[in-house]
A protein has these predicted regions:
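Generic structural signal for well-ordered alpha-helices
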Residues: 20, 41, 45-48, 82-89, ...
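N-terminal binding-site loop/beta-alpha segment at the start of enzyme catalytic domains
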Residues: 1-63
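A short, structured active-site edge motif that brings together acidic residues
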Residues: 59-73, 100-103
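Terminal-tail/helix-coil boundary detector
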Residues: 175-179, 201-236, 240, 255-261, ...
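Conserved, mostly hydrophobic/aromatic
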Residues: 23, 31, 44, 65, ...
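Aromatic-lined glycan-binding groove of carbohydrate-active enzymes
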Residues: 165-210, 244
């Protein structure tokens, strides 16, 4: 639900919840959001109320809403942490958060360990079901594990062009029973038929924050010419399986070791891709597909060297 935070088109709350109901009816039950994604947590609250009224309160357990807490730098007291979690629970209309994903801006400030200890206490007390992370690197995962703090997942950027989790993180997560939730898998929409065969777009043509962000990632990875080479290969694979380019991109990542799910953005009330998204689960990539993809990817730059580990682009 990052798209409701701004720079992706105006969101009408009623139409947005209409779209959320349609997604649920199509079998998409889990939402990813954050405390700072504009009205995202409030929309979850509205969605739950309308869902209970129209589908029955007894079915509310079908809905999963994975939110995030992204605190400002400062001292992490029990009061600070609990107050923030209480705000999210109130906005979302729940007694307990399904999954709380914690983000921290500055690793030199070890206050993230204090915050996580308090969050773990709140989990044990029943205010949070599962504790998780977002955009933490492998070294910080190790430190957190060494301090005995149990987390179930880490949300990181993971796509055909950004395979940094493969370098260190996936193996660490496998050893410590931590899963990965992947975002950025469709590069904000650039990994699609719309951009296949197109000249390199000017920045003024990229009309959402996501398109601008992931065009920068493509530039760091290898540039537009190599990206078109990748799209050519992926389009051929998509035609072979009678699916879309986006389906191939998601299938590739969801099958990676340690990946528990892929987050696909939705411009609620503006653009929906219900039927196309569902096709992701109706086919499998074969060894020939992987070889064709790898033949292009080996020509790219190593983003671990260019950017650093997962999440380093935010620090």
């Amino acid at each position: 639900m990052w798209q409701v935070s701004g720079a992706h088109g105006a969101i009408d709350p009623v139409r947005a919840v209409d779209a959320m109901l349609a997604y649920h009816d199509a079998g998409f039950f889990t939402w990813d959001l954050a405390d700072h994604y504009g009205p995202a947590e409030d929309l979850i609250g509205d969605f739950r109320r309308r869902f209970a009224a129209s589908r029955g309160a007894e079915r509310l357990s079908e809905i999963q809403a994975f939110t995030k807490w992204v605190p400002y730098p400062g001292r992490m007291t029990r009061r600070t942490v609990e107050d923030a979690i209480s705000v999210s629970r109130r906005r979302m209309g729940v007694d307990r958060l399904d999954l709380l994903q914690f983000h921290w801006w500055d690793y030199s400030d070890r206050g993230y360990l204090d915050a996580l200890r308090h969050l773990a206490d709140l989990r044990d007390e029943g205010q949070i079901r599962h504790l998780a992370l977002t955009n933490f690197d492998t070294e910080r995962l190790r430190i957190i594990a060494d301090h005995g703090i149990r987390v179930v997942s880490n949300q990181v950027q993971y796509s055909l062009i950004d395979r940094r989790p493969d370098a260190r993180m996936a193996a660490f997560c496998g050893d410590h029973k931590i899963t990965l939730l992947a975002y950025g898998t469709l590069l904000g929409g650039l990994l699609s038929e719309k951009y296949f065969g197109r000249p390199e777009p000017q920045r003024s043509e990229l009309n959402t924050a996501s398109l601008q962000k992931y065009k920068n990632m493509i530039d760091a990875w290898g540039g537009w010419k190599l990206f078109q080479e990748l799209l050519t290969v992926v389009n051929g694979i998509a035609e072979k399986h009678q699916v879309s380019i986006a389906n191939v991109g998601v299938r590739y990542v969801v099958d990676r070791p340690a990946v528990a799910g892929v987050i696909v953005g939705a411009r609620l009330g503006i653009a929906q891709h219900l039927a196309d998204n569902a096709r992701t689960f109706g086919f499998a990539l074969d060894e020939a597909d992987f070889q064709l993809i790898e033949a292009v990817l080996v020509k790219s730059r190593d983003l671990m060297t260019v950017i650093g580990d997962c999440g380093d682009e935010y620090r």
